């Protein structure tokens, strides 16, 4: 089992993994009755079939049977991918279309992941947290509970609640209740309850009631029922 706390082990896993190109291939054919096998699954009947699996194996089948095939159409969304997408069908979370979530992540209960968000291998999303549009969480990035990661934010380490469009370097921890200003580049740990901004980020003040009102969560958005 891969150690997701070791960046070198993750890199080695990606380097040595079998690269795959997942596809769906729709075919019309005459006098051909393809069957599911270890390399791909087959669905359909009456000379119209869908083949689902790795492109290289399916292409070999198509070439071997090209005289029986009258038409094809291929759907794909990657090429030689090292890490499959995460299967989140059974997560108790709201995940919008267009979110890109790699395998081996953890998604907490009632989390919300918006369209365009990118979550890489080993990332952890806490309960009741929202990952907003086009936010990026790098490998091993950890988002705590009740965090709102703002639109376009970039995270590459262990942290808690940043605001819109900061860049937070790997290994930096943002303390509980802290606010990271838009466009900030965070190179050092941020104390709990503080407000930082700038490039590099500097302490502006400790969070007051006005700042808390601006950054509080809209709980209704996390209702999945």
Residue ranges and their predicted role:
Residues 1-91, 212-225:
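Terminal amphipathic alpha-helical/low-complexity segments used for targeting or macromolecular assembly
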Residues 61, 158, 206:
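Residues that scaffold the ATP/ADP-binding catalytic core of kinase and kinase-like folds
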Residues 88-197, 201-203:
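Structural signal for interior beta-strand "rungs" in well-ordered beta-sheet cores
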Residues 189-225:
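C-terminal appended segment following the main domain
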């Amino acid at each position: 089992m891969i150690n997701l706390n070791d960046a070198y082990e993750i890199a080695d896993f990606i380097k040595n993994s079998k690269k795959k190109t997942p596809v769906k291939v729709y075919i019309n054919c005459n006098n051909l009755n393809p069957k599911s096998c270890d390399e791909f699954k087959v669905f359909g009947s009456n000379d119209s079939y869908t083949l689902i699996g790795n492109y290289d194996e399916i292409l070999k089948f198509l070439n071997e049977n090209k005289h029986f095939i009258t038409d094809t159409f291929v759907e794909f969304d990657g090429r030689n991918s090292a890490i499959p997408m995460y299967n989140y069908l059974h997560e108790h979370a709201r995940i919008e279309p267009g979110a890109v979530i790699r395998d081996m992540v953890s998604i907490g209960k009632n989390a919300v992941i918006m369209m365009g968000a990118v979550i890489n291998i080993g990332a952890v999303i806490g309960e009741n947290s929202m990952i907003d549009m086009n936010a990026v969480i790098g490998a091993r990035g950890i988002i705590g509970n009740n965090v709102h990661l703002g639109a376009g934010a970039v995270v590459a380490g262990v942290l808690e609640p940043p605001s819109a469009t900061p860049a937070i370097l790997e290994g930096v921890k943002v303390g509980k209740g802290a606010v990271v200003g838009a466009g900030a580049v965070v190179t050092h740990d941020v104390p709990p309850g503080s407000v930082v901004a700038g490039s590099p980020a500097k302490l502006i003040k400790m969070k007051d009631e006005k700042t808390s009102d601006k950054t509080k969560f809209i709980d209704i958005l996390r209702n999945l029922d």
